[in-house]
Amino acid sequence: MSIFKRAKKTVLIPPPHLLSGDEERVTILSAEGEIKVTGRRPTTLEEKIYYSMNLAAAIVGGDLHPSFKSMTYLFQKEMEFGSTQEKVNFGSRKPAPQTTYQVTKAREVYLQTQPLEKKIPMQTYSVSTEGATITFTGRFLFSSSHVGCDDNRTKLAGLDGFTTSNSYQRVKDYYAQETALALTFAAPEKRGKEK
């Protein structure tokens, strides 16, 4: 009889929506910092999603990055449920309300065929949209991990529910239309007098 006890190995069965060939890999996105909204404060869920989309696109360079949805979900959750602090910035010419959301070790996950191992140092990202300036000051950590670790499957299910929700779909369509309009915008041509 051995005096050493062998630890039991837990075999995790991935849920059906993960069985796409890359179920063994998942990337964790950890964020830490604060979101400042100067100007128009987001009050509805749709506004919070829209602000989050703009901020996520500014950070990862567009909505095609694999972590765009995950980052949008993360920021939206912090705006919806995180701790908030409001004040008026009297240092500017036009005193504008300033809302701060604390992002303390928030985590989301997303699937990727080739997981990144990337740590981004503390940086400031800022974007202006519809009467407000949204600024995130903080750091990110993208790290690969097994799909069963740290309750990632529950988080993926939450992300899946968020991206299929009616609110997200409405804002996504509006955001896509607005982005397309911004990309196709052309300056009006100057026309001379016709003889």
From Swiss-Prot:
Domain of life of the organism encoding this protein: Viruses
Name the keywords, alphabetized: Host cytoplasm, Viral matrix protein, Virion
One cellular component term from this protein's GO annotations in UniProt = host cell cytoplasm
Any Pfam family hit: Rhabdo_matrix
> Which cell locations does it reside in?
Virion; Host cytoplasm
Q: Name one GO molecular function term.
A: structural constituent of virion
What does the subunit section of this Swiss-Prot or TrEMBL entry state? Homomultimer.
Family from the record: Belongs to the novirhabdovirus matrix protein family.
The role this protein plays is: The M protein has a crucial role in virus assembly and interacts with the RNP complex as well as with the viral membrane.
What is the protein name stated in its UniProt record?
Matrix protein
